[in-house]
Curated annotation (Swiss-Prot):
UniProt function note: Involved in the degradation of protocatechuate (PCA) via the PCA 4,5-cleavage pathway. Catalyzes the oxidation of the hemiacetal form of 4-carboxy-2-hydroxymuconate-6-semialdehyde (CHMS) to produce 2-pyrone-4,6-dicarboxylate (PDC). LigC has 10-times-higher affinity to NADP than to NAD.
EC number: 1.1.1.312
Protein name from the UniProt record: 4-carboxy-2-hydroxymuconate-6-semialdehyde dehydrogenase
Catalytic activity as recorded in UniProt: 4-carboxy-2-hydroxymuconate semialdehyde hemiacetal + NADP(+) = 2-oxo-2H-pyran-4,6-dicarboxylate + NADPH + H(+)
Species name: Sphingobium sp. (strain NBRC 103272 / SYK-6)
Activity sensitivity to pH: Optimum pH is 8.
Sorted UniProt keywords: NAD, NADP, Oxidoreductase
InterPro entries noted in UniProt: Gfo/Idh/MocA-like_OxRdtase_N, Gfo/Idh/MocA_oxidrdct_glycsds, LigC_C, NAD(P)-bd_dom_sf
Length: 315
């Protein structure tokens, strides 16, 4: 499987590290905004080509599939371009920053029949897989998910502390993880409410947000998001269930009493991003729909679109 990766930033390298562990995968092309960065990352991971324009990679006959780790605002347009070029595509979360764009990607996926997968990593983290397996087996049901997504990002920096060329978003990026995961674990979302704090004068985004969700099963989700939190960074999920409580921190899982849970045997790796990439490659090879295909995550973007309308009305 011959791969091109666009967006050689902090998250792009996480994908490249995961892809190294998958048999038969070759990194052919690295595309990034800066030519020097693209060339440097290409050399590090053994890619024969680097450049600054996605169209260069899409024109290559030796590229089977593309992974997009580019700025949020480019995701939908680039995913469609990949499929128009006959390439399978995995687009990092979020699929789009509008409901209309998400629908457009879905339509193109249906037209082409190509694998179009979205990077909803929480579906693949061993911690969340552990809970999902118990739900599917009928061993527990979620009563409430309590989720905190906290960062300290008053300046436009990426995960490496480097300046970003684009602006992150609590609703369309960070909330997308939890909205999709809640539906994946507890059923279709039938009610959603949101409020947000003041808009940052320079970044032009809300720095604090609160979201409430309810699923068709009656489960509820309380999600707090902030770019103002000066403390432990990341997203932490508390699963309050009818048969126990668990806290998931990325790939790790503990009980509600902070007792470690062994999730090392849940899947072939403890790395959620690697597992996500393994699913992408396997779906292409096996000619099947992947977990977190655009079709399977689309409803998340319907909910985000509805929440955006609510927030706009609030002013």
């Amino acid at each position: 499987m011959r791969i091109a990766l666009a967006g050689a930033g902090a998250f792009g390298e996480k994908h490249l590290d995961g892809l190294k562990n998958i048999d038969g995968v070759e990194i052919v092309s690295i595309i990034s905004r800066k030519a020097e960065q693209a060339a440097e990352v290409a050399a590090k991971y053994g890619a024969k080509h680097s450049g600054t324009d996605l169209s260069e990679a899409l024109a290559r006959d030796d590229v089977d599939a593309v992974i997009l780790c580019t700025p949020t605002q480019m995701h939908a347009e680039q995913a469609i371009a990949c499929m128009n070029a006959g390439k399978h595509v995995q687009v990092e979360i979020p699929l789009a920053d509008s409901w209309a764009d998400a629908e457009a990607v879905m339509k193109k996926s249906q037209e082409t029949g190509l694998v179009c997968m979205v990077g909803h990593t929480r579906r693949f983290n061993p911690s969340h897989q552990y809970i999902h397996n118990k739900i599917v087996a009928g061993e527990l049901a979620i009563q409430q998910m309590d989720v905190q997504t906290y960062f300290f990002r008053r300046k436009n920096m990426n995960a490496k502390g480097e300046p970003r060329s684009w602006t992150d978003h609590l609703l369309w990026h960070h909330a997308a993880h939890t909205v999709d995961l809640f539906a994946y674990q507890a059923g279709k979302i039938v009610q959603a409410n949101a409020v947000q704090g003041p808009i940052h004068p320079e970044l032009g985004i809300a720095m604090d947000m609160s979201i409430q969700l309810k699923s068709e099963t009656g489960a509820i989700c309380t999600l707090s998001l902030s770019f103002n939190n000066d403390g432990p960074l990341g997203t932490f999920f508390r699963y309050i269930c009818d048969n126990g409580t668990w806290i998931a921190r990325y790939d790790d899982l503990v009980t509600g009493k902070e007792e470690p849970v062994d999730v090392s045997k849940v899947d072939v790796s403890m790395n959620g991003i690697e597992l996500q990439d393994r699913e992408f490659i396997a779906a292409i090879r096996e000619g099947r729909e992947p977990n977190s295909s655009v079709a399977r995550v689309l409803d998340c973007y319907r909910v985000l679109g509805e929440l955006e309308v609510q927030l706009e009305k609030q002013g």
